[in-house]
Amino acid sequence: MFEAVENGSADYGVLPIENSTAGDIRQTYDLLAKYNFYICKRTQIKINHCLAAKPGADIKTIYSHEQALKQCFGFLKDYHARQVPYTNTALAAEMVANSDDNTIAAICSERCAELYGLETVKRDIADNPDNTTRFICISKRPEATPDADIISICMSLPHTTGSLYRMLIRFALYGLNITKIESAPVPQAKQDIKRETFDVVFYLDFEGNALDPEVVRLMTILEEEMKYFKFLGNYKHFD
């Protein structure tokens, strides 16, 4: 998807970034750091997983995206079938439908099971009945609008005493509320960050608008002080 947006064959891309059960989707964050794309919208959707297979299947192996497998951990723990991560839930269902192997199944949506002619073996198998995933829409250009109210950035801090404190206190001094902060290993493919063993980048979401001069001033200061800084986008919360 990132390559499609990069080469112009798609204007926008939509991908998951966080799940209420399994947490952050690390691959998405790594891709945001690697490519020069921007988040322009964000929304959240309740996800209902089911176990799907061909009629009469003797299920020994279950395929699905690794996030779906994590979200259904409790169900799978008691099912005693081998779990195999797959590209995504839809492709897992397609693979099961096209296979001659009658011992495999997929975790996917009921709609997907219907689409590929699979039988729903078990409905609502996610551990959390309110299992919800946040999705972002990305574009090649930033799309700041007057009603955008969340800004996402990532940065790598200098290895000096108090650097994290000094970064965080700036948000308080500017009256900007941080809604999320996560640290993660520096993506292997990120060449413009000087990487050391166990070095990390911080991903932050905070309330603000990129058209606000005070917000621009803060991000300018951070860009000057950090080892690495990247603006990831400004968008409306759950637009």
Predicted feature locations:
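Domain-level signature for soluble enzymes in the chorismate/prephenate branch of the shikimate pathway
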Residues: M1-D239
